[in-house]
A protein has these predicted regions:
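Short N-terminal secondary-structure initiator segments
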Residues: 1-27, 95-114
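Nudix hydrolase/Nudix homology domain
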Residues: 2-9, 13-17, 80, 134, ...
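Short low-complexity stretches enriched in small and charged residues
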Residues: 14-17, 60, 93-100, 116-120, ...
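Acidic, metal-coordinating catalytic segment for phosphate/diphosphate chemistry
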Residues: 20-59
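Short glycine-rich, low-complexity/disordered patches
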Residues: 27-31, 141, 196-197
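N-terminal strand-loop-strand
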Residues: 45-83
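Unchanged
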Residues: 89-178
Length: 197
């Protein structure tokens, strides 16, 4: 039916359901997210800094596959090296959110990774740091990128941007998202298994 609007809750549920869990933790987080969605809880942040106290967020993994690196940003508020991303606006499709955030934060519009697709690749349920601790239910998307691409970081958001090697956990494992090591392991495994071309 032309012009028919999709239910935002069903769009989110489909994205969550489409993730193939990498480990027991991701499987448990996926079930938590599905139960949360199905229980009718609010999904979207409606007021800063953290209302409601559980809400959707997205990360954009910018992957230079040839160099085997990902871009992390030194997030000013979180005081940690994270993927670019942000909170999902009310009733917004998270796939739209992640593209919007890349444009707003870095002034780029890269394509979703050709082999990994435009669906969420990874998901996490994480308690954020004080002073405004809350629960982020985060969908992680993978984009094709290059270390040579021009990025214009928003200085209000980021202190720095840097490319990190996928297989150099010592470089990125310090002050970053607590689930970054699991994401990097899943991404490395998927790149080894994903068909080329």
């Amino acid at each position: 039916m032309p012009g028919r609007q999709l239910d935002p809750r069903l769009v989110v549920r489909d994205l969550v359901q489409s993730v193939v869990p990498y480990d027991e933790r991701e499987s448990a987080d996926q079930q938590w997210m599905l139960d949360w969605i199905d229980a009718g809880h609010p999904l979207f942040r409606t007021a800063k800094p953290a209302t409601p106290d559980r809400h959707l967020a997205v990360y954009a993994a910018l992957l230079d596959e040839a160099a085997r690196t990902v871009l992390l940003v030194d997030h000013a508020k979180a005081k940690a090296w994270l993927m670019p991303g942000g909170h999902v606006d009310p009733d917004e499709n998270p796939q739209v959110t992640v593209v919007r955030e890349l444009n707003e934060e870095l002034k780029i519009a890269p394509p979703f990774h050709a082999r990994l697709g435009s669906d969420a690749f990874f998901l996490t349920v994480t308690e954020t740091r004080p002073p405004h601790s809350h629960t982020d239910a985060t969908l992680w998307f993978v984009f094709s990128a290059s270390q040579q691409m021009e990025i214009v970081p928003d200085p209000a958001e980021f202190s720095a941007c840097r490319w990190f090697a996928l297989d150099d956990a010592g470089a990125w494992a310090g002050d970053s998202d607590p689930q970054m090591h699991r994401f990097m392991a899943k991404l490395t495994s998927a790149l080894e298994l994903a068909p080329v071309g």
